[in-house]
């Protein structure tokens, strides 16, 4: 089955699933007589009726994000397996792969640098270096293609940026930066592994030169899986990359909903202009804040073909802390006076949909107990949101585990069942992250352990 047939089948299944889900939710059928009050105000009282309707409308804050995910999943083929180079690698622009680390896991960094360098050579890449930016020296072996940059403890940015933003800004200082304005930087996390497809996609993006910033898909199920629960939960993020991320970059060339902090490709001149020096509010989710400022400055973004590989958090505690930091960082970004509402409106809707998740989750219990009169368009939109989010777990598993079930439908069925079983866990963790994130300290940067040898 070729990629075009797979994509057509996926689109047909997605549409059928949305319609069937709406049908089984009773959207297209009349309720049993007497089961729904004709006047909610008379039955529940004015205040409780208003609360019930507000809860229903709150559930639609995520609708713009869902529509973008639908557009991305249906308009663009996610099943092409090979990225073709458009020009000879020898003629490609100079690329710096930059890894930022605290220096707590030196062996992990060294091993991944070696692995990624081999992948670069396998892809035929010539004009590149790896740059490791660390708070503590990790003493990398001498190599003309590897540069270790230790951030001095006394270094301070003009605005007081901290954590990863501080380290990234240090690299851009005149007396530290060795790159030319037209060179490119690929930002990686400690555990990020390149693939030949990702390298080909990056080279095509850089060679094209139409956009200053780009990003691609990251999957989490390659290699040995440490925690199946967190890995299956992260399958949603894979579908989110192939849906919303791809849609916003391919159609609008803007980070309408922000972007991730890894597999980030930037042109040096543009990155130095935007900078990471945005104070504490730009230090928790420095990637998201950076994207909003870049959009404000008028820079354009594009989607990069080819995937990279990372690991999901190894423990549930790390998983919770990771989500908490994202929520707090996006909250600081959305509430920053440095970014105009026109640039952060969709990101704000996405944030508030997440922040009100504990309330919207209650509807699972409240809807049967306090039914409201039917409104076909409204009810269909609610079922659409639920159907699409469920499908994204399934689609994410299909893409993430394709190398593991290639010759076994039974394995695929097991992975899909596992993903569906993790949904309650994911909802619980996301709700906990909201509660901890909204009421906890917002000046901390939790480091997730991705070194498998320490587990």
From Swiss-Prot:
Subcellular location: Cytoplasm
One biological process term in Gene Ontology: response to toxic substance
UniProt GO cellular component terms: cytoplasm; membrane
Tissue: Endothelial cells.
Pathway per the UniProt entry: Protein modification; protein glycosylation
GO molecular function: beta-1,4-mannosyltransferase activity
4Fe-4S listed as a keyword: no
Keyword annotations from UniProtKB, A to Z: Cytoplasm, Glycosyltransferase, Insecticide resistance, Transferase
Keyword Zinc-finger: no
EC number annotated for this UniProt entry: 2.4.1.-
Phenotype of null mutants: Worms exhibit resistance to the Cry5B toxin produced by Bacillus thuringiensis. This is thought to be due to mutants having reduced population of glycolipids which are targeted by the Cry5B protein. Mutants also have reduced brood sizes at only 17% of wild-type N2.
Task of the protein: Glycosyltransferase with a proposed role in glycosphingolipid biosynthesis. Involved in susceptibility to pore-forming crystal toxins in conjunction with bre-1, bre-2, bre-4 and bre-5. Involved in resistance to the nematotoxic C.cinerea galectin Cgl2. Has a role in determining brood size.
PANTHER family on file: BETA-1,4-MANNOSYLTRANSFERASE EGH
Annotated family: Belongs to the glycosyltransferase 2 family.
Entry protein name: Beta-1,4-mannosyltransferase bre-3
The species this protein was found in: Caenorhabditis elegans
